[in-house]
Amino acid sequence: MDPANSSRPQPESTTTAAERTDNERSRLLRAAMDVLQRNGWWGFKVESVLRQAGLSTRSFYRHFDKKSDLLLALLEYELGGAAVNLRRVTAAAATPSDKVRAYVAATMDMAYREDLVKPSSLFASHWREMLPEYPDAFDRCVAEMMAPLVEAIREGIANGEFTSEDPEADAVAVFYLVAGVTADQATLGGVTPREQLEHVVMPFIQRAIGLR
């Protein structure tokens, strides 16, 4: 080996470069959530995020074209976490009926559980404004969140527990009903008692799929 070459800096490995890129993006997302929680939607500025993260403008544009792209990434992260939780709670339930009830309860938690309501409220009031710009991304997020419900309804049909001619359509109806009232309550601060919402939502679900 040429001694002259041995002292030269070696090219950074692809893995290390990828890890550094991921770390930088994670720092931006963490800082963005901190700024959003502190300043709210209307006080959210890219400059504040960069100060919080200790990163440059160049760092921002390596990952995002504009502020709304960063907000979308935050929303995808939050909804991705929600989807994981929904799958976990439904998987832990014993019967299809239990799975659907667990799914509904976990969704409503986002408007009433103290550790979940803050991020839920930040996005609940503005996701409709972002929807026209990012319809495909929203469709993917909804499909991921809705998947455990679709599976539970299909399982209930297969064992004769539910009656549904179109489990996916029924899952869509149930999802948007529950997610809609949850988003409203997250925005309003949970002014309507949870039990009252359950009395409205559950009879509809029972009629729609034969929930026991």
Where are these regions (language model features)?
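Amphipathic C-terminal alpha-helical segment
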Residues: 109-113, 151, 155, 174-192, ...
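Amphipathic alpha-helical packing segments from all-alpha helical-bundle domains
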Residues: 80-83, 132-159, 168-173, 199
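Helix-turn-helix
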Residues: 27, 35-69, 73
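N-terminal intrinsically disordered/low-complexity leader segments
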Residues: 1-23
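Hydrophobic alpha-helical connector segments
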Residues: 73, 77, 87-114, 171-174, ...
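Generic hydrophobic, amphipathic alpha-helix propensity
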Residues: 21-32, 49, 74-82, 86, ...
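Short secondary-structure transition hinges
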Residues: 108-150
